[in-house]
Amino acid sequence: MKITAKAWAKTNLHLGVGPARDDGFHELMTVFQTIDLFDTVTLTTLDEELVEEGSVVKQLSVTGARGVPEDASNLAWRAVDALVKRRAEKTPLSAVSLHISKGIPVAGGMAGGSADAAATLRAVDAWIGPFGEDTLLEVAAELGSDVPFCLLGGTMRGTGRGEQLVDMLTRGKLHWVVAAMAHGLSTPEVFKKHDELNPESHMDISDLSAALLTGNTAEVGRWLHNDLTSAALSLRPELRSVLQEGIRSGAHAGIVSGSGPTTVFLCESEHKAQDVKEALIDAGQVYAAYTATGPAASTADQRGAHILTVSQ
Protein backbone atom coordinates (compact mmCIF):
# COMPACT_ATOMS: atom_id res chain seq x y z
CA MET A 1 0.00 0.00 0.00
CA LYS A 2 1.18 3.52 -0.80
CA ILE A 3 -0.42 6.56 0.85
CA THR A 4 0.53 10.17 0.13
CA ALA A 5 -0.59 13.01 2.39
CA LYS A 6 -0.07 16.76 2.12
CA ALA A 7 0.31 19.50 4.71
CA TRP A 8 0.62 23.25 4.37
CA ALA A 9 3.16 25.69 5.74
CA LYS A 10 2.02 28.06 8.45
CA THR A 11 2.81 31.60 9.33
CA ASN A 12 1.91 33.59 12.43
CA LEU A 13 -0.10 36.76 11.90
CA HIS A 14 0.42 37.41 15.59
CA LEU A 15 2.78 35.79 18.06
CA GLY A 16 2.60 37.02 21.62
CA VAL A 17 5.03 35.35 24.02
CA GLY A 18 4.30 35.30 27.73
CA PRO A 19 6.58 34.20 30.55
CA ALA A 20 8.11 30.73 30.65
CA ARG A 21 6.00 28.14 32.47
CA ASP A 22 7.16 25.53 34.94
CA ASP A 23 7.37 22.97 32.11
CA GLY A 24 9.79 25.20 30.19
CA PHE A 25 7.30 26.24 27.52
CA HIS A 26 6.09 29.81 27.14
CA GLU A 27 2.46 30.84 27.32
CA LEU A 28 1.52 31.98 23.82
CA MET A 29 -1.20 34.00 22.17
CA THR A 30 -0.87 33.39 18.47
CA VAL A 31 -2.86 33.59 15.26
CA PHE A 32 -1.87 30.85 12.83
CA GLN A 33 -2.65 30.82 9.13
CA THR A 34 -1.83 28.18 6.53
CA ILE A 35 -0.27 29.36 3.30
CA ASP A 36 -0.05 27.33 0.13
CA LEU A 37 3.53 26.16 0.34
CA PHE A 38 3.47 22.49 1.25
CA ASP A 39 5.27 19.23 1.95
CA THR A 40 4.07 15.76 1.04
CA VAL A 41 4.73 12.54 2.93
CA THR A 42 4.42 9.15 1.26
CA LEU A 43 4.05 6.05 3.44
CA THR A 44 4.73 2.76 1.66
CA THR A 45 4.13 -0.59 3.35
CA LEU A 46 6.86 -3.20 2.98
CA ASP A 47 4.50 -6.16 3.03
CA GLU A 48 7.21 -8.79 2.93
CA GLU A 49 8.51 -7.62 6.33
CA LEU A 50 6.41 -7.90 9.50
CA VAL A 51 7.33 -6.07 12.71
CA GLU A 52 6.30 -7.45 16.10
CA GLU A 53 8.08 -4.92 18.32
CA GLY A 54 10.00 -1.69 17.90
CA SER A 55 9.47 0.90 15.18
CA VAL A 56 7.71 -0.15 11.99
CA VAL A 57 9.64 2.54 10.10
CA LYS A 58 12.60 0.99 8.31
CA GLN A 59 13.60 3.81 5.98
CA LEU A 60 13.07 7.56 5.67
CA SER A 61 14.20 9.67 2.72
CA VAL A 62 13.90 13.38 2.00
CA THR A 63 14.03 15.35 -1.24
CA GLY A 64 13.81 19.10 -1.81
CA ALA A 65 15.95 20.20 1.13
CA ARG A 66 19.25 19.53 2.84
CA GLY A 67 19.85 18.94 6.50
CA VAL A 68 16.57 17.20 7.32
CA PRO A 69 17.22 14.15 9.53
CA GLU A 70 16.53 10.79 7.92
CA ASP A 71 16.42 8.77 11.14
CA ALA A 72 14.22 8.26 14.19
CA SER A 73 14.76 11.87 15.30
CA ASN A 74 12.61 13.07 12.39
CA LEU A 75 9.18 14.15 13.61
CA ALA A 76 7.45 12.18 10.84
CA TRP A 77 9.13 8.96 12.01
CA ARG A 78 8.09 9.75 15.58
CA ALA A 79 4.52 10.38 14.40
CA VAL A 80 4.30 6.86 12.98
CA ASP A 81 5.58 5.31 16.19
CA ALA A 82 3.28 7.42 18.38
CA LEU A 83 0.11 6.51 16.49
CA VAL A 84 1.00 2.83 16.08
CA LYS A 85 1.23 2.64 19.89
CA ARG A 86 -2.41 3.75 20.09
CA ARG A 87 -3.69 0.65 18.27
CA ALA A 88 -6.14 -1.50 20.19
CA GLU A 89 -4.84 -4.63 18.42
CA LYS A 90 -1.21 -5.52 19.01
CA THR A 91 -0.80 -7.89 16.06
CA PRO A 92 2.35 -7.56 13.90
CA LEU A 93 2.31 -4.82 11.27
CA SER A 94 4.05 -4.45 7.94
CA ALA A 95 7.21 -2.40 8.04
CA VAL A 96 6.95 0.95 6.25
CA SER A 97 9.15 3.43 4.45
CA LEU A 98 8.58 7.19 4.49
CA HIS A 99 9.46 9.70 1.82
CA ILE A 100 9.18 13.44 2.48
CA SER A 101 9.11 15.88 -0.42
CA LYS A 102 9.92 19.35 0.94
CA GLY A 103 8.41 22.56 -0.33
CA ILE A 104 8.43 24.40 3.01
CA PRO A 105 11.64 26.21 4.06
CA VAL A 106 13.60 24.15 6.60
CA ALA A 107 14.15 25.59 10.11
CA GLY A 108 12.45 28.74 8.89
CA GLY A 109 9.65 29.31 11.39
CA MET A 110 7.00 27.90 9.04
CA ALA A 111 6.37 24.56 10.80
CA GLY A 112 7.89 22.36 8.10
CA GLY A 113 8.69 19.55 10.51
CA SER A 114 5.29 19.89 12.17
CA ALA A 115 3.59 19.79 8.77
CA ASP A 116 5.43 16.54 8.01
CA ALA A 117 4.25 15.07 11.30
CA ALA A 118 0.66 16.12 10.62
CA ALA A 119 0.71 14.65 7.11
CA THR A 120 2.18 11.44 8.53
CA LEU A 121 -0.59 11.18 11.11
CA ARG A 122 -3.15 11.39 8.31
CA ALA A 123 -1.28 8.71 6.34
CA VAL A 124 -1.06 6.32 9.29
CA ASP A 125 -4.73 6.93 10.07
CA ALA A 126 -5.59 5.95 6.48
CA TRP A 127 -3.38 2.86 6.80
CA ILE A 128 -4.42 1.33 10.14
CA GLY A 129 -7.15 3.68 11.43
CA PRO A 130 -9.48 5.30 11.85
CA PHE A 131 -8.31 6.54 15.24
CA GLY A 132 -10.71 9.49 15.46
CA GLU A 133 -9.90 13.20 15.34
CA ASP A 134 -9.58 13.53 19.13
CA THR A 135 -6.85 10.88 19.24
CA LEU A 136 -5.04 12.40 16.28
CA LEU A 137 -5.05 15.82 17.95
CA GLU A 138 -3.88 14.35 21.25
CA VAL A 139 -0.95 12.62 19.56
CA ALA A 140 -0.24 15.77 17.53
CA ALA A 141 0.06 17.84 20.73
CA GLU A 142 2.45 15.26 22.19
CA LEU A 143 4.66 15.56 19.11
CA GLY A 144 4.95 19.34 19.06
CA SER A 145 3.22 22.66 19.68
CA ASP A 146 2.54 23.42 16.00
CA VAL A 147 1.46 19.92 14.93
CA PRO A 148 -2.21 20.27 15.99
CA PHE A 149 -2.60 23.41 13.88
CA CYS A 150 -0.90 21.77 10.89
CA LEU A 151 -3.38 18.92 11.26
CA LEU A 152 -6.40 21.28 11.21
CA GLY A 153 -5.26 24.26 9.12
CA GLY A 154 -7.14 27.43 8.22
CA THR A 155 -6.82 30.52 10.41
CA MET A 156 -6.89 29.79 14.13
CA ARG A 157 -6.11 31.37 17.49
CA GLY A 158 -3.63 29.31 19.47
CA THR A 159 -3.11 29.55 23.22
CA GLY A 160 -1.25 27.49 25.80
CA ARG A 161 1.92 26.57 23.94
CA GLY A 162 -0.06 26.95 20.70
CA GLU A 163 -1.88 23.63 20.83
CA GLN A 164 -5.19 24.95 22.21
CA LEU A 165 -6.95 26.04 19.04
CA VAL A 166 -10.08 27.99 18.14
CA ASP A 167 -11.22 28.86 14.61
CA MET A 168 -11.14 32.52 13.59
CA LEU A 169 -13.43 34.16 11.07
CA THR A 170 -11.73 35.77 8.09
CA ARG A 171 -12.82 37.34 4.84
CA GLY A 172 -11.06 36.79 1.53
CA LYS A 173 -7.53 35.66 0.79
CA LEU A 174 -4.26 37.23 1.90
CA HIS A 175 -1.36 37.51 -0.54
CA TRP A 176 2.07 36.80 0.88
CA VAL A 177 5.70 36.82 -0.14
CA VAL A 178 7.85 34.31 1.73
CA ALA A 179 11.56 35.14 1.91
CA ALA A 180 13.76 32.23 2.96
CA MET A 181 17.34 32.46 4.19
CA ALA A 182 20.14 30.05 3.39
CA HIS A 183 20.58 28.98 7.01
CA GLY A 184 17.90 28.26 9.59
CA LEU A 185 17.46 29.36 13.19
CA SER A 186 17.00 27.08 16.17
CA THR A 187 13.64 27.69 17.85
CA PRO A 188 15.05 27.00 21.35
CA GLU A 189 17.89 29.48 20.70
CA VAL A 190 15.42 32.16 19.63
CA PHE A 191 13.30 31.66 22.76
CA LYS A 192 16.45 31.71 24.90
CA LYS A 193 17.48 35.03 23.36
CA HIS A 194 13.93 36.32 23.82
CA ASP A 195 14.12 35.53 27.54
CA GLU A 196 17.46 37.36 27.76
CA LEU A 197 16.06 40.45 26.02
CA ASN A 198 12.75 40.23 27.92
CA PRO A 199 10.68 42.48 25.63
CA GLU A 200 7.11 43.48 26.40
CA SER A 201 4.52 40.75 25.75
CA HIS A 202 1.66 41.46 23.36
CA MET A 203 -1.22 39.09 24.17
CA ASP A 204 -4.17 41.09 22.79
CA ILE A 205 -5.36 40.08 19.31
CA SER A 206 -8.67 41.99 19.26
CA ASP A 207 -7.55 44.54 16.64
CA LEU A 208 -6.18 41.83 14.35
CA SER A 209 -9.35 39.77 14.78
CA ALA A 210 -11.46 42.75 13.73
CA ALA A 211 -9.21 43.46 10.76
CA LEU A 212 -9.43 39.87 9.53
CA LEU A 213 -13.23 40.18 9.47
CA THR A 214 -13.08 43.23 7.19
CA GLY A 215 -10.91 41.62 4.52
CA ASN A 216 -8.99 44.92 4.32
CA THR A 217 -5.41 43.88 3.62
CA ALA A 218 -3.84 47.16 4.72
CA GLU A 219 -5.71 46.98 8.03
CA VAL A 220 -4.61 43.38 8.59
CA GLY A 221 -1.05 44.43 7.84
CA ARG A 222 -1.25 47.18 10.44
CA TRP A 223 -1.81 44.61 13.19
CA LEU A 224 0.70 41.91 12.26
CA HIS A 225 3.06 41.36 15.19
CA ASN A 226 5.68 38.94 16.48
CA ASP A 227 7.20 39.17 19.97
CA LEU A 228 10.15 37.04 18.80
CA THR A 229 11.26 39.65 16.25
CA SER A 230 13.83 41.31 18.49
CA ALA A 231 15.36 37.93 19.37
CA ALA A 232 15.51 36.82 15.74
CA LEU A 233 17.06 40.14 14.66
CA SER A 234 19.59 39.92 17.47
CA LEU A 235 20.71 36.50 16.24
CA ARG A 236 20.44 37.38 12.54
CA PRO A 237 20.89 41.17 12.10
CA GLU A 238 20.70 40.88 8.31
CA LEU A 239 16.96 40.19 8.61
CA ARG A 240 16.42 43.87 9.37
CA SER A 241 17.47 44.91 5.87
CA VAL A 242 15.31 42.16 4.35
CA LEU A 243 12.28 43.51 6.20
CA GLN A 244 13.11 47.05 5.10
CA GLU A 245 13.50 46.00 1.46
CA GLY A 246 10.13 44.25 1.44
CA ILE A 247 8.36 47.35 2.74
CA ARG A 248 10.28 49.60 0.36
CA SER A 249 9.18 47.36 -2.51
CA GLY A 250 5.50 47.84 -1.75
CA ALA A 251 4.38 45.34 0.88
CA HIS A 252 1.86 46.57 3.45
CA ALA A 253 3.81 44.89 6.24
CA GLY A 254 6.58 42.40 6.88
CA ILE A 255 7.29 40.23 9.90
CA VAL A 256 9.52 37.40 10.97
CA SER A 257 7.56 34.15 10.64
CA GLY A 258 7.44 32.30 13.96
CA SER A 259 10.96 31.93 15.31
CA GLY A 260 12.47 32.86 11.93
CA PRO A 261 14.60 33.39 10.00
CA THR A 262 11.99 33.29 7.22
CA THR A 263 10.25 36.62 6.77
CA VAL A 264 6.78 37.08 5.28
CA PHE A 265 5.33 40.14 3.60
CA LEU A 266 1.64 40.94 3.24
CA CYS A 267 0.74 42.48 -0.12
CA GLU A 268 -2.38 44.05 -1.58
CA SER A 269 -2.64 41.68 -4.54
CA GLU A 270 -1.05 38.72 -6.28
CA HIS A 271 0.51 41.14 -8.77
CA LYS A 272 2.04 43.27 -6.01
CA ALA A 273 3.32 40.13 -4.29
CA GLN A 274 5.12 39.17 -7.49
CA ASP A 275 6.74 42.62 -7.61
CA VAL A 276 7.92 42.36 -4.00
CA LYS A 277 9.25 38.84 -4.58
CA GLU A 278 11.30 39.98 -7.58
CA ALA A 279 12.64 43.00 -5.68
CA LEU A 280 13.81 40.82 -2.80
CA ILE A 281 15.55 38.43 -5.19
CA ASP A 282 17.15 41.30 -7.13
CA ALA A 283 18.45 42.82 -3.88
CA GLY A 284 20.41 39.61 -3.29
CA GLN A 285 19.55 39.44 0.40
CA VAL A 286 17.54 36.21 0.48
CA TYR A 287 18.20 32.60 -0.46
CA ALA A 288 14.83 32.17 -2.14
CA ALA A 289 11.48 33.93 -2.34
CA TYR A 290 8.00 32.62 -3.09
CA THR A 291 4.52 34.02 -3.48
CA ALA A 292 1.72 32.35 -1.55
CA THR A 293 -1.87 32.86 -0.48
CA GLY A 294 -3.59 32.13 2.78
CA PRO A 295 -5.57 30.48 4.14
CA ALA A 296 -4.28 27.77 1.87
CA ALA A 297 -7.26 25.63 0.86
CA SER A 298 -10.58 26.46 -0.73
CA THR A 299 -12.39 23.33 0.50
CA ALA A 300 -12.95 22.23 4.09
CA ASP A 301 -11.49 18.76 3.62
CA GLN A 302 -8.17 20.21 2.41
CA ARG A 303 -7.69 23.07 4.87
CA GLY A 304 -5.31 21.06 7.04
CA ALA A 305 -3.18 17.97 6.49
CA HIS A 306 -5.06 15.64 4.17
CA ILE A 307 -4.76 12.51 2.06
CA LEU A 308 -3.86 12.96 -1.61
CA THR A 309 -3.73 9.39 -2.90
CA VAL A 310 -4.08 5.81 -1.69
CA SER A 311 -3.04 2.90 -3.87
CA GLN A 312 -2.56 -0.81 -3.30
Swiss-Prot record:
InterPro entries: GHMP_kinase_C_dom (IPR013750), GHMP_kinase_C_sf (IPR036554), GHMP_kinase_N_dom (IPR006204), IspE (IPR004424), Ribosomal_Su5_D2-typ_SF (IPR020568), Ribsml_uS5_D2-typ_fold_subgr (IPR014721). The keyword Cell inner membrane does not apply. GO terms for biological process: isopentenyl diphosphate biosynthetic process, methylerythritol 4-phosphate pathway; terpenoid biosynthetic process. Its EC number is 2.7.1.148. Pfam families: GHMP_kinases_C, GHMP_kinases_N. It is an enzyme of class 2 (transferase). Pathway: Isoprenoid biosynthesis; isopentenyl diphosphate biosynthesis via DXP pathway; isopentenyl diphosphate from 1-deoxy-D-xylulose 5-phosphate: step 3/6. This is 4-diphosphocytidyl-2-C-methyl-D-erythritol kinase. It comes from Corynebacterium glutamicum (strain R). The gene is ispE.
